[in-house]
Amino acid sequence: MADDIDFTSGDAGASSTFPMQCSALRKNGFVVLKGRPCKIVEMSTSKTGKHGHAKVHMVGIDIFSGKKYEDICPSTHNMDVPNIKRCDYQLIGIIDNYLSLLSDSGDVREDLKIPDGDLGKEILAKHEAGEEILVTVLNAMSEECAVALKAMTK
């Protein structure tokens, strides 16, 4: 009976976001806009009006898809900020459009797809050329994606 239970992908139940006051957010920081983790690329504050608070206008780029999102909120309100984890993995192979990655601790993971666009093409080209590369993987709000690559130091 207990053989069909899989505990390998559990987490400690920690939240994928934490609250931060709007006025404390900064450009190049991260925030959740329309339910997506975004990097803040533009921010402006309007003055306190006759009725109500100063407003903060934010423009963010989704860290996974590159889409642009905008939001306006009172400066005293809290916004969610995603917990972002960044890890470097050594690329050891590519199997059926999935990256085979080796972590610092020696664990191998093969569950990440080759990213779309130029980054994916660059990873494929460098792998086929036999270069040793490190792939940077971003993890936020239970989503993961390869976002960068760099040559390994010898």
Curated annotation (Swiss-Prot):
It is found in: Cytoplasm; Nucleus; Endoplasmic reticulum membrane. Signal peptide: none annotated. One of its GO terms (biological process) is translational elongation. Gene3D superfamilies: 2.30.30.30, Nucleic acid-binding proteins (2.40.50.140). Pfam families: eIF-5a (PF01287), IF5A-like_N (PF21485). Lys-50 undergoes hypusination, a unique post-translational modification that consists in the addition of a butylamino group from spermidine to lysine side chain, leading to the formation of the unusual amino acid hypusine. eIF-5As are the only known proteins to undergo this modification, which is essential for their function. This is Eukaryotic translation initiation factor 5A-1. GO terms for cellular component: endoplasmic reticulum membrane; nucleus. Belongs to the eIF-5A family. InterPro entries: IF5A-like, IF5A-like_N, NA-bd_OB-fold, Rib_uL2_dom2, Trans_elong_IF5A_hypusine_site, Transl_elong_IF5A_C, Translation_prot_SH3-like_sf. Translation factor that promotes translation elongation and termination, particularly upon ribosome stalling at specific amino acid sequence contexts. Binds between the exit (E) and peptidyl (P) site of the ribosome and promotes rescue of stalled ribosome: specifically required for efficient translation of polyproline-containing peptides as well as other motifs that stall the ribosome. Acts as a ribosome quality control (RQC) cofactor by joining the RQC complex to facilitate peptidyl transfer during CAT tailing step. Its main location: cytoplasm. Binds to 80S ribosomes. Actively translating ribosomes show mutually exclusive binding of eIF5a (eif5a or eif5a2) and eef2/eEF2. Interacts with dapl1 (dapl1.L and dapl1.S); interaction takes place at the polypeptide exit tunnel of hibernating ribosomes and prevents translation. It is a peripheral membrane protein. The lineage of its organism: Eukaryota, Metazoa, Chordata, Craniata, Vertebrata. The modification Hypusine is found at K50. GO terms for molecular function: ribosome binding; RNA binding; translation elongation factor activity; translation initiation factor activity. Keywords: Cytoplasm, Elongation factor, Endoplasmic reticulum, Hypusine, Initiation factor, Membrane, Nucleus, Protein biosynthesis, RNA-binding.
